[in-house]
């Protein structure tokens, strides 16, 4: 058994330096934020694509008769609101959207602009953090305002990514109801 263990260990020792030569992926700098940025970017593109692709006439669509369920347009506004809120908290600065409620906007053009502005704001946040800075605690005032215990910046970014993806799933349902193919199901170009 010890000989087998030594042989396996020796094999790993030989394989690790050979990885770059065999085309295997080598661990990049900031692997956590590299991974999270790639997932956030993919999903933000799906969401922005869905907002663009959905015809304006369906922005008032609900998937059923329940008025407490958001319309497609309200989902777009909700995502704009929360991307500004969460990313401003991660940055430790005042929400640039404070006092506005994009869920109340009516026109597709206004909603798409609000969403794209929110994503542009978050792009900077996701793109500027390293693994080390992502592990820093949120500013004390953010924690106090939110009523949260000590949280790390990355916690909120992961929440934002999951929240975006959750609501993209909702958007897909609205699109499918109207026989519109969502961006994530379009054939690769």
Listing of model-derived features with the role each one plays in the protein:
Residues 46, 50-51, 87, 118-121, ...:
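Well-ordered alpha-helical scaffold segments within catalytic/enzyme domains
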Residues 37-41, 45-48, 59-100, 142-189:
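Short, contiguous alpha-helical
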Residues 16-20:
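Sec/Tat signal peptide C-region and signal peptidase I cleavage site
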Residues 22-42:
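Short N-terminal segments immediately surrounding and downstream of signal-peptide cleavage
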Residues 55-59, 91, 127, 131-134:
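Short, flexible helix-adjacent loops and helix caps
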Residues 104-141, 150-167:
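Acidic/histidine-rich alpha-helical segments that form the ligand environment
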Residues 6-15:
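Bacterial N-terminal signal peptides
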Residues 1-4:
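Positively charged n-region of N-terminal signal peptides that target proteins for export
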């Amino acid at each position: 058994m010890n000989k087998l263990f030594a042989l396996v260990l020796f094999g790993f020792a030989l394989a690790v330096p050979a990885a770059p030569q065999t085309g295997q992926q080598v661990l990049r700098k900031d692997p956590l934020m590299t991974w999270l940025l790639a997932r956030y970017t993919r999903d933000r593109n799906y969401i922005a694509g869905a907002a663009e692709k959905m015809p304006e006439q369906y922005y008032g669509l609900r998937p059923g008769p329940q008025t407490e369920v958001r319309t497609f347009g309200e989902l777009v506004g909700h995502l704009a609101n929360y991307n500004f809120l969460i990313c401003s908290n991660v940055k430790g600065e005042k929400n640039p959207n404070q006092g506005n409620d994009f869920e109340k906007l009516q026109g597709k053009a206004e909603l798409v602009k609000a969403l794209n502005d929110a994503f542009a704001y978050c792009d900077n946040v996701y793109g500027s953090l390293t693994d080390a800075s992502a592990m820093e605690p949120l500013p004390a005032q953010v924690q106090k305002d939110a009523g949260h215990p000590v949280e790390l910046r990355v916690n909120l970014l992961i929440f934002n990514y999951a929240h975006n993806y959750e609501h993209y799933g909702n958007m897909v349902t609205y699109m499918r109801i109207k026989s519109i193919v969502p961006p994530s199901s379009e054939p690769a170009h």
